[in-house]
């Protein structure tokens, strides 16, 4: 199927198309920028923004030159903002190779308040930077500049030698040089004396805690909360959440302003408003600040001998371009602070230890934009806190996007049901004439079916002439395609697109046959866009030449007025599914029978393969649990212990035979009862808790010992129908570790003897001081990671020791890095962490999974001097048990997926059977043939009911709604017996119908398909239990009981007698028991008995000499003549 625009799927081809669009958009950005530079005051923004349709051809060479010049200017501009100064250094000699023109005045001017002796340094090309600052400042700067990940140490606090003024030195490395921004420390600030990560976090701690506490499931709530927190944190006049759409245009999705400011919520902007080059810079430099758009820029003087132009991409001081400054001033924004929101681009994580393979592809999802109506400066600690907050926000956005994808996957299952429902009724006209119809399939403004040269319409549609014109165009220009999807018929080249107007801009069309088509239509995008700000006042008119929000919004509407909202991938999947089903809807009965046989074969194969695989996994699971060296125990739904392995018996002193049958809450310490009770309740509801700590009592000789401390994972035990039948606990004994930790925290003197003790009970421990430098690394950590103490000491714990790039212990991705930072910073501020899952790659590539516990380290006065981090590792046996558990879950999931697939696939041949039956009904048939067709219809209705039974619990627990249908008992009985005739003939069993004629002709009210299902199930079990050559009979009696004047109850009793030894006791106990351990046949009997109970009836089974009888009683209503 062809498409006029590139899709946004995660495949390589779509990425190449996406890259091509970015390149094309960059050329458009460059052209717009060149027009602005050349036109000066005569620049017309509204007309220039519509450059998307400029032909390439002969203008391409010029366009390439314009683009190259534009990118050079964006990345290698030679001006900075005046709120600070800049130096560029040679990385080897630390001598100045470039400086801003205001640097000599800011850094070397003599202050009369600071006495000085000797010559004053003069700032210029070639000067050693260490001569400009005090001795300690020069040493701190030299240490930082020699650091691998230099940005981790930002900011470095330095003092000028001449004036004594404090500055934050913010360093970043570019090719061939070091760039340093110097920002004055304001008099009201408390100077930050060390690396900023742990210090800056305190500013954003409240906001991060609030974001992380939000319930998932609402992107709008998440964005609104983020905007609110940034508004309170920064104090700017306006804060907006800005999202990029698939076609790169932007939308304000959340906003908060101070009173009196015009809102921009809901405004859409063309992609050119934030150029691709600027977006690239946001990916590199996550926070961007403009202090005063009216301030005069300062030139950067560069050593003329340098063989390259300096790039200022990573500098906060980098001056914005004049077109952006005009845009800001026109929207009454003098200062801005912008944070990038960078999320995963949909790739799966690699499992390789190679960092390039294990990182996800990133994309710029949007921006958090702060504006101020007056000049405003945000100091570096606040900007760093904002960057950290934006990283946490990006992780949460990513999770919301994953939830949305899961929701879409669930919609696929719903769609399959919807499609089948459509085709079960009068295909194909039922998909437009009944409800639900094809407009319910996807979001659209109109749809049409062209079938046998007749048009069937829904919603907005072209005229007959226009639609036939579209079909002719498709047949001529898209001959080899099965259809077309486009968000702009005009851009796709349809000659009559403009005549269709705004009502039909986008179209998805699929070919069903040579002459039959399906169409969906969408109106132009502007119809979906809502202006969220104040309306124009009477007589007020925008200046379309200027760059500001109203002109951008107008420009956006101009660009999209012939375009609709794009068709999403999942929408096209639905369309393709309907197309394929319609194509196959009219296959002959032979094809239907072939499909049915194929499905039965798959079911049988699945049963055999699945049971063998499940038995093998179960046997291995039991062996591992019994022999595991970790405590494993289990309870049933009532909390009674039904599993207690050797290890937990050894730890507690309670033998297996004594533990079985006891309630779990009687075995745990009183202080842990509430914790365990909560775990049980959540697990039985399907919510499995992990890494929960509780204590369990000791018994026998160990009764007087301390209780056993466990870290426990709870998982729900489920049967083959995915019903929860108990809870399994996989634990880790931490009694020894806890005693060590308790002793450790009480130590006031020299703790090093404990930390560095190589005793196996000492867990892996590492630590950091209050500034983020690694200060502890015990021998257990060396054994675990492969890195010696000397390799990591005095390195930044966040970034150098644990990080995502060149760190000693590489974390899996950026999300893990940010979460680790949050854990450490929470602990510094007093929020000590529970056992948290943690993972990293050790020195030689092995991935280590463990639990992390972080505690703050205090001095004698109680002040925080750093952190201690303890790692807890799972034993080999526990890891193997968890691996087998995952295999078991994967096997169950595989079975469920295959069963769900087969259940859906049954619908298609079933619709073919129905169609064939309806065709036969229209022919001349004899009375006997009509009766056979009627029996077939009865069986089909029963099958429909069973396929709709997705929730067995509702039947078993008695919540199913029964239908009230009028039926003759004769019809139900014939359909039920027909379902066992093949089996009985194979065993040469004679079935006799001993019902009296009057009873068979009785007309009743009730759920006839369910009654038919019940009788067929009991007949089948009876046939299975009857020996070959035996006999089976069915008889019944009816008792009427009048209630009132018009209603009569029918108390109906069926007796199914069969010869032989009878139904096995085990099967009968399953019928009268629960579904927990029932076999497939037992489940069938149990469901049948529950259905009988829903009909106010009961089932009995009598054994006699040489024969047995099922007695089934139900309560129905008699259909009176007056009714």
From Swiss-Prot:
Contains one covalently linked phytochromobilin chromophore. Gene3D superfamilies: 1.10.287.130, 3.30.450.270, 3.30.450.40, Histidine kinase-like ATPase, C-terminal domain (3.30.565.10), PAS domain (3.30.450.20). Residues 218-401 form the GAF domain. GO terms for molecular function: phosphorelay sensor kinase activity; photoreceptor activity; protein homodimerization activity. Residues 901-1118 form the Histidine kinase domain. The keyword Repeat applies. The keyword Transcription regulation applies. Residues 1-14 have a biased composition (Low complexity). GO terms for biological process: detection of visible light; red, far-red light phototransduction; regulation of DNA-templated transcription. Residues 1-20 are annotated as: Disordered. InterPro entries: GAF (IPR003018), GAF-like_dom_sf (IPR029016), HATPase_C_sf (IPR036890), His_kinase_dom (IPR005467), HisK_dim/P_dom (IPR003661), PAS (IPR000014), PAS-assoc_C (IPR000700), PAS-like_dom_sf (IPR035965). Residues 690-746 form the PAC domain. Residues 617-687, 747-821 form the PAS domain. Disulfide bonds: none annotated. GO terms for cellular component: nucleus. Homodimer. Regulatory photoreceptor which exists in two forms that are reversibly interconvertible by light: the Pr form that absorbs maximally in the red region of the spectrum and the Pfr form that absorbs maximally in the far-red region. Photoconversion of Pr to Pfr induces an array of morphogenic responses, whereas reconversion of Pfr to Pr cancels the induction of those responses. Pfr controls the expression of a number of nuclear genes including those encoding the small subunit of ribulose-bisphosphate carboxylase, chlorophyll A/B binding protein, protochlorophyllide reductase, rRNA, etc. Belongs to the phytochrome family. This is Phytochrome A. It comes from Solanum tuberosum (Potato).
């Amino acid at each position: 199927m062809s498409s006029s625009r590139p899709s946004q799927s995660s495949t390589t081809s779509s990425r190449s198309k996406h890259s091509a669009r970015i390149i094309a958009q960059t050329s458009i950005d460059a052209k717009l920028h060149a027009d602005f530079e050349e036109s000066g005051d005569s620049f017309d923004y509204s007309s220039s923004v519509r450059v998307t349709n400029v032909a390439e051809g002969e203008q391409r060479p010029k366009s390439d030159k314009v683009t190259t010049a534009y990118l050079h200017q964006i990345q290698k501009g030679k001006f900075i903002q005046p709120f600070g100064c800049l130096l560029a250094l040679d990385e080897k000699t630390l001598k100045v190779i470039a400086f801003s023109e205001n640097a000599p005045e800011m850094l070397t001017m003599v202050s009369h308040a600071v006495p000085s002796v000797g010559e004053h340094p003069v700032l210029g090309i070639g000067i050693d930077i260490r001569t400009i600052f005090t001795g300690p400042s020069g040493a701190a700067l030299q240490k930082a500049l020699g650091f691998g990940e230099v940005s981790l140490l930002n900011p470095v606090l330095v003092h000028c030698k001449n004036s004594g003024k404090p500055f934050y030195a913010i360093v970043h490395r570019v090719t061939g040089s070091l760039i340093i921004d110097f920002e004055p420390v304001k008099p009201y600030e408390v100077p930050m004396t060390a690396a900023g990560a742990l210090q800056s976090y305190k500013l954003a701690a409240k906001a991060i805690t609030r974001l992380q506490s939000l319930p998932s499931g609402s992107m709008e709530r998440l964005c609104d909360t983020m905007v609110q927190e940034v508004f309170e944190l920064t104090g700017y006049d306006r804060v907006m959440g800005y999202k990029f759409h698939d076609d790169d245009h932007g939308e304000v999705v959340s906003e908060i302003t101070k009173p009196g400011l015009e809102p921009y919520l809901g405004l859409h902007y063309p992609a050119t408003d934030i150029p691709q080059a600027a977006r690239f810079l946001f990916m590199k430099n996550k926070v961007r600040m403009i202090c005063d758009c009216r301030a005069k820029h300062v030139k950067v003087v560069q050593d003329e001998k340098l063989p390259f132009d300096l790039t200022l991409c990573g500098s906060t001081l980098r001056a914005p371009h004049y077109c952006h400054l005009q845009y800001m001033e026109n929207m009454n924004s003098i200062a801005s602070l912008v944070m990038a929101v960078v999320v995963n681009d949909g790739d799966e994580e690699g499992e390789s230890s190679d960092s390039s393979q294990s990182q996800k592809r990133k994309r710029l999802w949007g921006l958090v934009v702060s504006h101020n109506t007056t000049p405003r400066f945000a100091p570096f600690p606040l900007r760093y806190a904002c960057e950290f907050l934006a990283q946490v926000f990006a992780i949460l956005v990513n999770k919301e996007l994953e939830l949305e994808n899961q929701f879409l996957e669930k919609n696929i299952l719903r769609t399959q049901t919807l499609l089948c429902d459509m085709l079960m009724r009068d295909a194909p006209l039922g998909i437009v004439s009944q409800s639900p119809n094809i407009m319910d399939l996807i979001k659209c403004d109109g749809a049409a079916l062209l079938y046998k040269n007749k048009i069937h319409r829904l919603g907005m549609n072209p005229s007959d002439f226009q639609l036939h014109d579209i079909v002719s165009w498709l047949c001529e220009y898209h001959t080899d395609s099965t259809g077309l999807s486009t968000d702009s018929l005009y851009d796709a080249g349809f000659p009559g697109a403009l005549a269709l107007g705004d009502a039909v801009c986008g179209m998805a069309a699929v070919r069903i046959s040579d002459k039959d088509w399906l169409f969906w239509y969408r109106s132009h995008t502007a119809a979906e866009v809502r202006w969220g700000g104040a309306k124009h006042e009477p007589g007020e008119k925008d200046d379309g030449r200027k760059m500001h929000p109203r002109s951008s919004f107008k420009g956006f509407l101009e660009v999209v007025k012939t375009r609709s909202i794009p068709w999403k991938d999942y929408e096209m999947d639905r369309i393709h599914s309907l197309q394929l089903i319609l194509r196959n809807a009219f296959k002959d009965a032979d094809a239907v029978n072939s499909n049915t046989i194929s499905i039965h074969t798959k079911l049988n194969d699945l049963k055999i393969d699945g049971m063998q695989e499940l038995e093998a996994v179960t046997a291995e699971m039991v062996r591992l649990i019994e022999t595991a060296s970790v405590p494993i125990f289990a309870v049933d739904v009532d909390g009674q212990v039904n599993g207690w392995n050797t290890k937990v018996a050894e730890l507690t002193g309670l033998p297996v035979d004594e533990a079985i049958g006891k309630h779990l809450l009687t075995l745990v310490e009183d202080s842990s009862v509430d914790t365990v009770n909560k775990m049980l309740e959540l697990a039985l509801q399907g919510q499995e808790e992990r890494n929960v700590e509780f204590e369990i009592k000791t018994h026998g000789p160990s009764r007087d010992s301390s209780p056993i401390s466990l870290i426990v994972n709870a998982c729900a035990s489920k049967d083959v129908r995915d019903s929860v039948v108990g809870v399994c606990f996989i634990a880790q004994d931490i009694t020894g570790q806890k005693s060590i930790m308790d002793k450790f925290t009480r130590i006031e003197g020299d703790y090093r003897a404990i930390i560095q003790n190589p005793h196996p009970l000492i867990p892996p421990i590492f630590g950091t001081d209050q500034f983020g430098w690694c200060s502890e690394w015990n021998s257990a950590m060396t054994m675990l990671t492969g890195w010696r103490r000397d390799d990591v000491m005095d390195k930044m714990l966040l970034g150098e020791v644990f990080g995502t790039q060149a760190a000693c212990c590489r974390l899996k991705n950026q999300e893990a890095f940010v979460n680790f930072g949050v854990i450490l910073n929470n602990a510094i501020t007093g929020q000590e962490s529970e056992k948290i899952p943690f993972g990293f790659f050790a020195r030689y590539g092995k991935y280590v999974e463990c639990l992390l516990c972080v505690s703050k380290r205090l001095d004698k006065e109680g002040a925080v001097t750093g952190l201690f981090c303890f790692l807890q590792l799972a034993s080999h046996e526990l890891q193997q048990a968890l691996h087998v558990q995952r295999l078991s879950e994967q096997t169950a999931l595989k079975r469920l997926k295959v069963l769900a697939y087969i259940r859906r696939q049954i619908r298609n041949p079933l619709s073919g059977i129905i169609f064939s039956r309806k065709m036969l009904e229209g022919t001349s048939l004899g009375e006997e043939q009509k009766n056979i067709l009627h029996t077939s219809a009865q069986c089909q209705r029963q099958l429909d009911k069973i396929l709709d039974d997705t929730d067995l619990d509702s039947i078993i627990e008695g919540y199913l709604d029964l239908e009230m249908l009028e039926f003759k008992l004769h019809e139900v009985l014939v359909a039920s017996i027909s379902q066992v005739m093949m089996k009985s003939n194979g065993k040469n069993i004679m079935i006799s119908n001993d019902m009296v004629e009057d009873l068979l002709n009785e007309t009743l009210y009730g759920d006839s398909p369910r009654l038919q299902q019940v009788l067929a199930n009991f007949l089948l079990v009876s046939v299975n239990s009857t020996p070959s050559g035996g006999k089976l009979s069915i008889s019944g009696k009816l008792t009427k009981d009048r209630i009132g004047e018009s209603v009569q109850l029918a108390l109906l009793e069926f007796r199914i007698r069969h010869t032989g030894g009878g139904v096995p006791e085990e099967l009968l106990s399953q019928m009268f028991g629960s579904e927990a351990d029932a076999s497939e046949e037992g489940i069938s009997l149990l469901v049948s008995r529950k259905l009988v109970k829903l009909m106010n009836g009961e089932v009995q089974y009598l054994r006699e000499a040489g024969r047995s009888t099922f007695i089934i009683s139900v309560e129905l209503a008699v259909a009176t003549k007056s009714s």
